[in-house]
């Protein structure tokens, strides 16, 4: 029987998962077992082309096996598509840093990170940075973080402010653009610019995720065939209403998941 074990096609005479596990690890107990994206301790009958992953806890695998292990919990056949995608994340604050990390964990092959700012203490309440990153450019800090999570992702950085003059050259090679700015003017400039210069290019933007209002008011809406908007559309940051990690993270999750759906050619919200 032909199966896929840790990303490699093999022939086996084993009929069940337990038989296969014993063949490779005898009676070791520190083995994580994943079948077609699902972790299980149960015995399972093997069948042709089933995908099985064994991970020995505490042991660093070879580079060839490591990439497969990173995506072992993915839904089957997702990784082949996402690793070919190139996504731009414009703005690396509370939304953008969380979105970029999510996409890196998902296995997106190329991430294009754009921001001109540096990490400062007030960023740490909602952004994916650490004390050790203070004073670093956000592009550099986030690239370093991603390298520790998914070393197979190519990370391209541009330490610039997006303007009408550079927008077309910045985003011409990206499959999908993610708007993650924190000011209305920047949001409008990017969304309108992508729609104008790149007909057919998908853009996922945000509006309304400040404060600590209900999580359930944050939605993903399809505005046009190529423009998606995440948030509640109302709760912008202002005096007396700040940006908090939980709701910012929820909105970032909406954006990252919509980007994943678009990569997988799922166009409905």
What are these regions (language model features)?
Residues 139-174, 181-184:
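A structured beta-alpha segment of the ubiquitous adenosine-cofactor-binding alpha/beta core
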Residues 42, 53-87:
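N-terminal charged helix/coil linker that caps or initiates catalytic domains
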Residues 1-10:
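Eukaryote-biased recognition of intrinsically disordered, low-complexity regulatory segments
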Residues 113-150:
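Glycine-rich phosphate-binding loop and adjoining beta1-alpha1-beta2 segment
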Residues 6-7, 30-46:
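Short acidic beta-strand-loop surface patches of small beta-rich interaction domains
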Residues 25-26, 32-38, 172-176, 180-269:
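Glycine-rich phosphate/adenylate-binding loop
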